[in-house]
Amino acid sequence: MSSGGLLLLLGLLTLREGLTPVSSKDRPDFCELPDDRGPCRGIFHAFYYNPDQRQCLEFIYGGCYGNANNFKTIDECKRTCAA
């Protein structure tokens, strides 16, 4: 196989890996935590993974503390937690 063909194959495999959903066995434990606004009073739109619904949902984050099941974008949430 030519070097161009090998690069194409490597690129396709890398793309496939990036698009493969996270399996439940690979999902970080913090994805099971509930949404947690935290004690601060800010209004920040954030996303958390809801294990019962098996999807990422929006919630209002207060801006401090909370827990690790807190993502700035739905895409980041899906990449990390969604199966």
Curated annotation (Swiss-Prot):
InterPro entries: Kunitz_BPTI, Kunitz_BPTI_sf, Prtase_inh_Kunz-CS, TFPI/VKTCI-like
The protein, known as: Blackelin-4
Residues of the signal peptide: 1-24
Compartments, as annotated in UniProt: Secreted
GO annotations of cellular component type: extracellular space
Record-linked SUPFAM superfamilies: BPTI-like
Ranges where the BPTI/Kunitz inhibitor domain occurs: 31-81
Role noted for this protein: Serine protease inhibitor.
Cited CDD domains: Kunitz_textilinin-like (cd22594)
Top-rank lineage group of the source organism: Eukaryota
Organism: Pseudechis porphyriacus
Disulfide bonds: 31-81, 40-64, 56-77
Reactive bond for trypsin (site feature) positions: 41-42
